[in-house]
Each structure stands twice: as C-alpha cells, then as structure tokens.
C-alpha cells in the first residue's frame, strides 16, 4: 500500500483541480463551459486512474516481469481510453465548448507533470 499512496494522492489532487476548474468555468462562462471543462478533466483523469490501477497492481522483485508488463498494458490502455473518450465527447455532446474541454484536459495533465515539484518532499522517508 505505501508504494500506491503517492499515485492515489496525485489522482486525488487531479480530481480536485478538475472540479475546481469546472465549477469556475460554470460560474464565469456558463453551464456549457462548465460541463465541457468537466468532460475535459474526466478525459484526462479516468485514463490516469486506469493506468494507476494497472501499473501498481504488483510489487516486489519477484514480480518484475509482471510489473513491466502491467506498465506497458496500463499505458496502452490509457492511450486507447483517452482516444475513445475524446471521440465520445465530440460525437455525443452538443453543444460543446472545445477551448474549455482542452483547457481543463491540459490543466489536469499539468498536475501530473508538476507533481514531482509540488509533492516530491512528501514522498521521501528519513
């Protein structure tokens, strides 16, 4: 469980960022911007959840092959899931505000890019 804790924290921070961004868009630009932003955030967050589940199922030196295999499967599944979710959003949601969708999508990805800078010190042990 301790090796999974940083991934869980990151997913939780991403979810909070998605919700705050979607609510901010809803208040400032209206409901279409709000749900478009929420969709964009979910398009980034759900595949990250899938990857975390797949990547951190195994631990220990004896499971090295399974760990590598699960990382590859998690990343492939993440890419496919992202493409499918984008396709569903653009095909099935009308009206959709694309700048809000892509903006919150990128903001959510940036949380994971910046996580080592923001949360790095909380993961180390003495």
Curated annotation (Swiss-Prot):
A single GO cellular-component term from the record reads: proton-transporting ATP synthase complex
Share an example GO biological-process annotation for this protein. proton transmembrane transport
**Per UniProt, which keywords does this protein have?**
Cell inner membrane, Cell membrane, CF(0), Hydrogen ion transport, Ion transport, Membrane, Transmembrane, Transmembrane helix, Transport
Q: Which InterPro entries match?
A: ATP_synth_I (IPR005598)
What Pfam families does the entry give? ATP-synt_I (PF03899)
**Residue ranges crossing the lipid bilayer per the database entry:** 10-30, 32-52, 71-93, 98-120
Membrane topology value: Multi-pass membrane protein
**Record flagged with keyword Lyase:** no
Coiled-coil zones: none
Q: Where in the cell is it found?
A: Cell inner membrane
Similarity comment text for this entry: Belongs to the bacterial AtpI family.
Function, please?
Answer: A possible function for this protein is to guide the assembly of the membrane sector of the ATPase enzyme complex.
- By what name is this protein known? ATP synthase protein I
Q: Which gene encodes it?
A: atpI
């Amino acid at each position: 469980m301790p090796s999974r804790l940083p991934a869980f924290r990151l997913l939780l921070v991403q979810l909070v960022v998605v919700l705050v961004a979607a609510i901010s868009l809803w208040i400032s630009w209206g409901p279409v911007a709000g749900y478009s932003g929420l969709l964009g955030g979910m398009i980034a967050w759900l595949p990250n959840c899938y990857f975390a589940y797949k990547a951190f199922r195994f631990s220990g030196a004896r499971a090295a092959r399974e760990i590598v295999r699960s990382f590859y499967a998690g990343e492939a599944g993440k890419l496919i899931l992202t493409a499918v979710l984008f396709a569903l959003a653009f095909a099935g949601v009308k009206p959709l505000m694309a700048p809000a969708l892509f903006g919150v999508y990128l903001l959510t990805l940036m949380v994971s890019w910046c996580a080592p800078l923001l949360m790095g010190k909380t993961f180390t042990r003495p």
